[in-house]
Amino acid sequence: DNIRVPICEGFKRPPFDVKQGLLNSMIDHAFVERGWNSQPWVDTSKDRKSSQKGDFSIQTECGLNILVEVEFGNVASTFRDLYKFNLAYSTESYDCGIFILPDKDLAKRVDTIQNVDGARTLIEDARDSINLPLVLIGVGFDGNEIDLLTIKNDVNYWKTYKLDDFNSVIRD
């Protein structure tokens, strides 16, 4: 199943038409629906010393503990995520990580965010200091966008959304 990227022309200056908050909610919903834990502690030890949380985690049938970070934010957010992966390694809480970021084309439509190629460069530059094995995934458009104006033809509505307003959109 694919997530339809939510777009709304006019809610920001061109070319930024992707509704990032809704996209994040749709990704959250997709992971939880597939059995992943949402907002897990990065340090899972009984005497936890860190209050850091990841985006998702799961323990596979073979016992592999996986931490996921989905990042549609700026470069500083990418560094925070890389810190969380190192914390997961140092606390021996997770066996590997999955780092999901937009590809270049999607990043250009979201506004001032890091893309998967930029993150790859950061990881390669810091390869001696990133200890948790990582799978890096770039996501982009597949041509199956959802034009939010076909749901409610009111740009101002989409500019001032609340998370609760999107339950019907996320489920569809």
Language-model region placement:
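A short, surface-exposed helix-loop junction/capping segment
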Residues: 2-14
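Generic alpha-helical secondary structure signal
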Residues: 21, 25, 114-117
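Structural motif
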Residues: 65-66, 96
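Short catalytic-loop micro-motif centered on adjacent basic/acidic residues
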Residues: 67-71
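Catalytic cores of nucleic-acid endonucleases
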Residues: 72-127
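Domain-level recognition of nuclease-like catalytic cores that cleave nucleotide substrates
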Residues: 104-172
